[in-house]
């Protein structure tokens, strides 16, 4: 009867094993030791043999220093000390779960249920054939007995041992863990080692004499309530009433390494491998970090998750091909954070440049590719304004222990970054904080973020721009997209004050992680992500929707169905702009197109075409002339204006002869250096001369010349059947 302690790899140490044994046996940590030469066994309750992964229960009368030991059979070990020899039995299985011993399952340590299932459920037949074990397709925490006690909701103070026992058994036997309650988590036996580099650098750069290895970074750890493994499956009945809950406080913290992690996810290889897990229909609340995934999450699924009352809803080293359904982030300080972890000194992301040189894959680059979320709803904590210390503390926490901006300085200049870099790598990602934002995806080492998409999103209070993706200048490969989003209370500092003067983010405050930003950069997306459709509700600081316009690389064709007898003119595509109201900038109508001025090369003048009328005003010898007809028609061809003027008065008396002047032209002419007036003029009183039209430079006034010397035409005095006709072109300034 072998009582093995199954402890997967990945951020697991001897200390962690001892803590796990103490937890499942109900002992103090100092009462559990690894079995090794020279061990003083006096006062110990349990010893652990790492070679056979077995736990042995001492009788309490053993003394002396261990000289040797011999496992007689699967149930017995003989330990020899410098005082005596002792026969010890393996930690016995205790079958307790209900009043009928024949139907009980569970163990005293929560790790050997399989033996009991084999011994008991294999012998209980079902009416439909087979045995009871065949019908057991899931595990619950209530199936386990620890320290002769089973979990009773509302009575048991700490559900962590029962939760972990169920998860461990489910992992071993490929069974899902089903939660039917919100289980309290008081203890945090799991250990997570925070990101750090090992001090090494790519050997080729050392050989070249331009880089060298240095001391590794110090080890820092955090505590977690439960741990999921590769292929772990944990599901509840709904996101409201089933899950786990801690007692961490958003208002008072702690906001440092003493904070807690709810769900720690890690595969066998820790940071240097993939992990695949499945969490559905759960509520995770009351932890500094709701869920933390070590390694690259690949082919994992999450659905109907509510993460509430947490500091950071999730931290992920990276992910690839992950699918999420409905993710509801309810009253937290920061949404999910992906990537951005300092895990190597090398300014590179190719496996050749990553330890152990080469790495089996680029896990330590923390890449993010091809994830899809159906619904992503973020509700900021309306009781905590951005001025609350929780925001700055958690921003600093993530930078201090994950992103580590100070490390981005090259080693030669006092930082930890390699002096060399991979050829063609994009710029390092910049840290812009994580709090007051729905989702943050960082690229730490210049590897592009590719196609991390959301179908539908809802934002209810996000002081910063809700979505941020690192964008490498010059590369927009993998442009991620959000299908549609609804916004409410975005870009404001104090939730209750709304979008008012003094409360506008980036305008009325300085973001400590983006101090040069003096206007709100975007309502929805910053960096290499864009939203395709935006609904703006109340109290949103107005800006562009996306800092970088999303790219549609596949091309598009827009088609509209109409009634076969419909002959009306209608819009097939309209582009509008909002500043104070919606204004149509481009309308592609079924019968015409309304467009802005055309530019045929990037540095050329804008082309406009226009047609209209105006009323010319005539002066002769400085006197205004009353006319019975004054018609002006113009056509605009870019910067060239074509004019037709017709003036009539069949009984006009002119008292004083003098120069001819017509004002009121539709456009101001350009300076004389850019062109002259060209055209013809006719009036019956101009005999023996050829009249020349001239628009005075930088005015809207037409004068009439009678020769090329520039002599003004003087209209004679008298009473006339007056008529005047002019057709001419003149030039106006470019782009006016």
From Swiss-Prot:
Example of a GO biological process term: symbiont entry into host cell via disruption of host cell glycocalyx
Main localisation: virion
Domain of life: Viruses
GO cellular component: virus tail
Transmembrane segments: none
Secretion signal, residue range per the UniProt entry: none
Keywords on record: Degradation of host capsule during virus entry, Degradation of host cell envelope components during virus entry, Host-virus interaction, Viral attachment to host adhesion receptor, Viral attachment to host cell, Viral tail protein, Virion, Virus entry into host cell
rRNA-binding listed as a keyword: no
Compartments in which it is found: Virion
Functional description taken from the UniProt entry: Functions as a receptor binding protein (RBP) and probably mediates the attachment to the host capsular exopolysaccharides. Displays a depolymerase activity that specifically degrades the KN4-type polysaccharides of Klebsiella pneumoniae capsule.
Entry protein name: Depolymerase, capsule KN4-specific
Organism of provenance: Klebsiella phage K64-1 (Bacteriophage K64-1)
């Amino acid at each position: 009867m072998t009582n093995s302690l199954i402890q997967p790899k990945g951020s697991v140490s001897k200390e962690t094993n001892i803590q796990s044994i103490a937890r499942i046996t109900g002992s103090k940590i100092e009462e559990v030791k690894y079995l090794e030469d020279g061990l003083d066994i006096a006062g110990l309750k349990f010893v652990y043999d790492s070679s056979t992964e077995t736990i042995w229960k001492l009788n309490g009368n053993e003394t002396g220093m261990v000289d040797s030991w011999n496992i007689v059979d699967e149930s017995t070990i003989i330990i020899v000390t410098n005082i005596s020899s002792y026969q010890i039995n393996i930690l016995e299985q205790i079958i307790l779960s209900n009043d009928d011993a024949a139907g009980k399952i569970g163990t005293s340590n929560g790790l050997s249920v399989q033996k009991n299932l084999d011994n008991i459920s294999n012998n209980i037949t079902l009416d439909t054939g087979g045995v009871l074990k065949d019908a057991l397709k899931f595990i619950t925490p209530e199936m386990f007995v620890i320290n002769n006690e089973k979990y009773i909701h509302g009575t048991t103070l700490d559900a962590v041992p029962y939760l972990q026992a169920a998860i461990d058994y489910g992992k071993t036997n490929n069974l899902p863990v089903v939660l039917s309650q919100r289980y309290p988590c008081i203890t945090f036996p799991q250990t997570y080692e925070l990101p750090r580099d090992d001090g090494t650098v790519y050997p080729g750069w050392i050989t070249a004499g331009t880089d060298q290895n240095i001391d590794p970074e110090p080890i820092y750890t955090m505590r977690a309530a439960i741990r999921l493994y590769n292929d772990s499956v944990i599901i509840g009945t709904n996101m409201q009433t089933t899950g786990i809950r801690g007692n961490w406080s958003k208002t008072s913290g702690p906001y440092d390494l003493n904070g807690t992690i709810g769900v720690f996810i890690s595969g066998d290889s820790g940071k240097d491998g993939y992990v695949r897990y499945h969490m559905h229909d759960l509520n995770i609340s009351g932890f500094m970090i709701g869920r933390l995934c070590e390694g690259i999450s690949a082919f994992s699924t999450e659905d109907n998750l509510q993460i509430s009352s947490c500091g950071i809803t999730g931290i992920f080293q990276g992910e690839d091909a992950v699918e999420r359904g409905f993710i509801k982030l309810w009253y937290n300080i920061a949404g999910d954070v992906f990537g951005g972890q300092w895990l190597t000194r090398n300014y590179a992301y190719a496996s050749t440049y990553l330890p152990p040189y080469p790495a089996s894959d680029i896990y330590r680059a923390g890449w993010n590719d091809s994830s899809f979320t159906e619904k992503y709803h973020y509700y900021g904590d309306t009781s905590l304004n951005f001025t609350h210390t929780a925001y700055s503390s958690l921003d600093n926490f993530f930078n201090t222990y994950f992103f580590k901006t100070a490390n981005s300085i090259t080693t030669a200049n006092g930082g930890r970054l390699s002096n060399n870099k991979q050829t063609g790598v994009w710029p390092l990602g910049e840290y812009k904080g994580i709090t007051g934002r729905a989702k943050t995806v960082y690229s730490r080492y210049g590897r592009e973020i590719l196609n991390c998409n959301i179908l539908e999103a809802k934002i209810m209070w996000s002081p910063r721009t809700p979505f941020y993706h690192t964008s490498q200048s010059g590369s927009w490969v993998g442009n991620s997209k959000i299908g549609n989003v609804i916004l409410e209370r975005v870009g404001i500092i104090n939730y209750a004050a709304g979008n008012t003067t003094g409360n506008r983010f980036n305008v009325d405050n300085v973001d400590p992680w983006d101090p040069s930003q003096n206007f709100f950069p975007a309502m929805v997306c910053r960096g290499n992500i864009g939203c395709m459709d935006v609904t703006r509700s109340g109290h949103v600081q107005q800006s562009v929707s996306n800092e970088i316009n999303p790219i549609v690389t596949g091309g598009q064709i827009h088609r509209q169905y109409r009634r076969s007898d419909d002959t009306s003119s209608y819009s097939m595509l309209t582009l509008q702009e909002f500043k104070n109201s919606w204004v149509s900038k481009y309308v592609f109508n079924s019968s015409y197109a309304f467009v802005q001025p055309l530019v045929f090369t990037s540095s050329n003048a804008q082309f406009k075409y226009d047609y209209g009328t105006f009323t010319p005003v005539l002066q002769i010898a400085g006197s205004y002339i009353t006319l019975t007809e004054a018609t002006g028609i113009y056509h605009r061809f870019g910067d060239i204006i074509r004019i037709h003027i017709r003036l009539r008065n069949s009984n006009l008396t002119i008292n004083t002869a003098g120069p001819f002047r017509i004002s009121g032209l539709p456009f101001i002419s350009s300076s004389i250096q850019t062109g002259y007036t060209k055209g013809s003029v006719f009036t019956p009183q101009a005999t023996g001369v050829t009249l020349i039209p001239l628009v005075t430079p930088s005015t809207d006034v037409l004068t009439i010349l009678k020769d090329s010397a520039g002599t003004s035409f003087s209209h004679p005095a008298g009473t006339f059947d007056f008529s005047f006709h002019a057709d001419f072109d003149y030039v106006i300034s470019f782009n006016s």
